[in-house]
């Protein structure tokens, strides 16, 4: 009789280890152990969690998202033994969740409460700050889309920056609308051999910094709380405590950190006053990281040269907000992650993670519910 690794064995250690670990129960007994004091994203599970069982048990997967028939087929074909449950009406969701082992999409509170036996939720969101408390407190493993949108967000971040440095927002675009050929009213700037400071080296920080270095010849400095190898294009990578030492050195300061208790209003008066008067601030992470009153003062009083925001607090930004009156500020409506291939990338990640789950392999984008990212 064919056997495979138990999915419940895959998740058996999470109760003791927390949802920060994606376990790989296919590892042989006596597998590698982590170094004392370390907290890796992937931990190889050892013998007690490796269970042999018949391979015929289906994986009941509830879909809590709008997907086309072709997209559902892609997910269904990701692994053998997948039973997709696609509720057509809201009233059917609770019953579907009650029998599901996996939920894909954006389950509402009622669905989460009914999902007593769910072991894993693959959420469509990149950030966690707006997810239901019931989901964050649920014992299930949670994965998200944290790196799916990063490449296109990086392009948007650099687009915001170029619109400032090359006078596109201040002059070129308004003058074009008026059919005017007029010299720039603001000093034009370049990025070559300038310094980028990245706050956060997750997907967004990685993609922006790589493009800035190799595409524009910028030097990259960065801070991030996670221990990680320094990418070859990054000159210096330090812990967050180095932030205020980094800020005065940079010509562009990028906010690419997640929204957590530690990062609320991280970018305030102290940071903006420490920046060069010729420096730019770019935020493509979350609006809550910025003290917007301090940013408005920084722009109006000339503490910094300009800023580009794809995110604000609240959203949409009210017409009477002080930011609308700021010079050399560009705001886009939180659309930096949008692109025609967005849905393709989402489905591709979901299918890959489902394949991994069915095979007892480590999942991608496992969230640490305690840290908030």
Regions flagged by a language model, labelled:
Residues 25-35:
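Signal peptide processing junction and immediate N-terminal pro/mature segment
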Residues 278, 284-373:
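Rossmann-like dinucleotide-binding domain for NAD(H)/NADP(H)
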Residues 14, 107, 125, 257, ...:
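Glycine-rich, N-terminal phosphate-binding loop of Rossmann-like dinucleotide-binding domains
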Residues 7, 34-141, 268:
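An N-terminal-biased, well-structured beta-alpha scaffold segment characteristic
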Residues 225-322:
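Rossmann-like adenosine-cofactor binding region
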Residues 140-195, 199, 207-211, 215, ...:
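Phosphate-binding beta-alpha-beta segment of Rossmann-like dinucleotide-binding domains, i.e.
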Residues 1-18:
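N-terminal secretory signal peptides and thylakoid transit peptides that target proteins
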Residues 204:
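Hydrophobic/small residue at the entry helix of a nucleotide-binding pocket
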């Amino acid at each position: 009789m064919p056997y495979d690794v138990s999915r419940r064995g895959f998740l058996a250690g999470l109760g003791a280890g927390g949802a920060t670990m994606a376990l790989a129960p296919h590892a042989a007994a006596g597998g590698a152990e982590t170094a004392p004091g370390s907290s890796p994203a992937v931990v190889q599970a050892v013998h007690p969690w490796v269970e042999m069982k018949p391979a015929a048990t289906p994986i009941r997967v509830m879909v809590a998202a709008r997907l086309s028939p072709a997209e559902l087929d892609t997910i269904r074909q990701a692994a053998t033994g997948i039973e997709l449950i696609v509720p057509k009406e809201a009233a059917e969701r609770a019953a579907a969740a009650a029998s599901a082992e996996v939920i894909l999409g954006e389950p509402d509170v009622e669905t989460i409460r009914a999902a007593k036996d769910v072991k894993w939720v693959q959420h469509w969101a990149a950030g966690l700050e707006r997810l239901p408390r019931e989901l964050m407190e649920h014992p299930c493993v949670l994965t998200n889309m944290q790196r799916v949108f990063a490449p296109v967000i990086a392009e948007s971040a650099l687009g915001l920056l170029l619109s400032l440095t090359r006078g596109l927002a201040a002059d070129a675009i308004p003058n074009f609308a008026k059919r005017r050929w007029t010299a720039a009213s603001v000093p034009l700037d370049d990025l070559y051999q300038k310094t980028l400071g990245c706050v956060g080296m997750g997907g967004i920080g990685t993609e922006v910094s790589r493009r800035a270095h190799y595409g524009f010849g910028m030097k990259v400095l960065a801070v991030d709380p996670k221990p990680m190898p320094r990418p070859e294009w990054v000159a210096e990578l330090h812990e967050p405590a180095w932030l205020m030492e980094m800020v005065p050195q940079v010509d562009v300061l990028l906010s690419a950190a997640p929204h957590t208790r530690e990062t609320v209003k991280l970018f305030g008066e102290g940071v903006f006053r420490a920046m060069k008067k010729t420096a730019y601030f770019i935020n493509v992470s979350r609006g809550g990281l910025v003290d917007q009153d301090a940013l408005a003062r920084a722009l109006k009083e000339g503490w910094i040269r300009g800023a580009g925001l794809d995110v604000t607090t609240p959203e949409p930004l009210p017409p009477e907000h002080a930011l609308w009156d700021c010079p050399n500020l560009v705001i886009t409506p939180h659309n930096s992650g949008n692109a025609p291939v967005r849905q393709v990338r989402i489905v591709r990640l979901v299918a890959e993670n489902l394949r991994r789950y069915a095979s007892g392999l480590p999942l991608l984008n496992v969230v640490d519910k305690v840290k908030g990212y």
